[in-house]
Amino acid sequence: MTYARIAKSSRYLPEFAVSNDDLSQIMETSDEWIKTRTGISSRRISQQENTSDLAIQVAKQLLAGEDPAGVDLIIVATMSPDAYTPATAALVQAAVGAENAACFDLSAACSGFVYALDVAEKMLRRPGGMALVIGAETLSKLVDWQDRTTAVLFGDGAGGVLVKNDALEPHFLASQLKSYGHLAKFLSAGQTSPQPFPGPVTDLAPFKMNGREVYKFATHKVPEVITACLEEAGVGLAEVDLFLFHQANYRIVKQVARRLDLPEEKFPCNIAEYGNTSAASEAILLAELAEEGKAQAGDLVVLAGFGGGLTAAAQLVRL
């Protein structure tokens, strides 16, 4: 019997960087105001690329040296797809020539990558099989650029992993996926309204967020989900090498580390450079750490996400 493992990670960010000072030219804000509340200094904004374009770049990097025909599954976690249909994953499939892959998008907002990784691990049962799991977002198209409470937070980007079913021992050790639909009103984007026939197609609603409630949710529920995940695996907090969090707000990461009574060094962050890239953030962070040699084969890692739904998720993985 063989088991699924993360064989490779990759990331892709648009070239165009927008600093806090740049934003202060178009809205009432400042570098100090943004940094002290979020930890963000800059973010990448797509100019001509859509979500599928970012995801395709990641997929091509992941499949370098691999036979695309051997890919069984492509999942793209996104809340900012190119269109309602076709799925972003189908566009990725066509671009890389993965003709045998089942393809679909998964929408769980900022928990999406962890959700997608768990789904892929459970679906990938063919020995030697491969899956592409990608988080990709162009959130800039859902932002109200006059609303400083949300516009300063988000950036565009993509990250992903190649999962292979060829390990001789388990690498995906435990997971917890949670949803709290009664809290949905605290974070939303992209709503449409029913239109009487033959009413016009309406624009998508921009981000709306109750920051105080989302902060409260994240700093309480994420530690609970992580603790439950580790208990399922019989692993202690101190045994985990890295906690790779959804990069929403540096203050949230610090508070979760404090609640778990763990050193902040175990919670690496790149939010200062990229902002909140939603479903892409954990994958971007993992790829960046792997490139720098800070996440290596054998490391015990917790991937954790939280966001719209509201949702929270944790996955314990041996790299």
From Swiss-Prot:
PANTHER family documented for this protein: 3-OXOACYL-[ACYL-CARRIER-PROTEIN] SYNTHASE, BETA-KETOACYL-[ACYL-CARRIER-PROTEIN] SYNTHASE III, CHLOROPLASTIC
GN (gene name): fabH
Comment text on domains: The last Arg residue of the ACP-binding site is essential for the weak association between ACP/AcpP and FabH.
Keyword Electron transport: no
GO CC term, one of those recorded: cytoplasm
Function recorded in the entry: Catalyzes the condensation reaction of fatty acid synthesis by the addition to an acyl acceptor of two carbons from malonyl-ACP. Catalyzes the first condensation reaction which initiates fatty acid synthesis and may therefore play a role in governing the total rate of fatty acid production. Possesses both acetoacetyl-ACP synthase and acetyl transacylase activities. Its substrate specificity determines the biosynthesis of branched-chain and/or straight-chain of fatty acids.
Family classification: Belongs to the thiolase-like superfamily. FabH family.
Catalytic machinery residues: C110, H246, N276
Keyword Phosphoprotein: no
Region annotated ACP-binding, chain positions: 247-251
Catalysed transformations (reactions): malonyl-[ACP] + acetyl-CoA + H(+) = 3-oxobutanoyl-[ACP] + CO2 + CoA
GO MF, any single term: 3-oxoacyl-[acyl-carrier-protein] synthase activity
UniProt protein name: Beta-ketoacyl-[acyl-carrier-protein] synthase III
Annotated GO biological process: fatty acid biosynthetic process
Enzyme class: transferase
